């Protein structure tokens, strides 16, 4: 049986941490002038994959 291949798009978007899978934040790339300082600060906070999606993300990363 051949080796499992990691989904390269998922590998660039998710980081596996000790207790969770870290992900990026949406709405933080462009058109930032109309967004308030508070909203942009909240978008900078770390985000983690929801528990219902952890298994599917792990399978993309060949961790399951």
Swiss-Prot record:
Pfam families from the UniProt entry: Ribosomal_L35p (PF01632)
Q: What GO annotations for molecular function exist for this entry?
A: structural constituent of ribosome
InterPro entries named in the record = Ribosomal_bL35, Ribosomal_bL35-like, Ribosomal_bL35_CS, Ribosomal_bL35_sf
PROSITE patterns the UniProt entry points to: RIBOSOMAL_L35
Question: Which Gene Ontology BP annotations are present?
Answer: translation
| Keywords recorded for this protein, A-Z | Ribonucleoprotein, Ribosomal protein
Using the record, list the residue span of the signal peptide; answer none if the entry has no such feature: none
Q: Which GO terms describe its cellular component?
A: cytosolic large ribosomal subunit
Q: Which family does it belong to?
A: Belongs to the bacterial ribosomal protein bL35 family.
Name it: Large ribosomal subunit protein bL35
In its UniProt entry, the species of origin is given as Helicobacter hepaticus (strain ATCC 51449 / 3B1)
Q: Which gene encodes it?
A: rpmI
């Amino acid at each position: 049986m051949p080796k499992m291949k990691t989904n390269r798009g998922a590998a660039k978007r998710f980081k596996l941490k000790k207790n969770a899978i870290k992900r990026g934040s949406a709405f933080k790339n462009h058109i930032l002038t109309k967004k308030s300082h508070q909203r942009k600060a909240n978008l900078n906070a770390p985000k983690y994959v929801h528990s219902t999606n952890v298994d599917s993300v792990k399978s993309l990363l060949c961790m399951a």
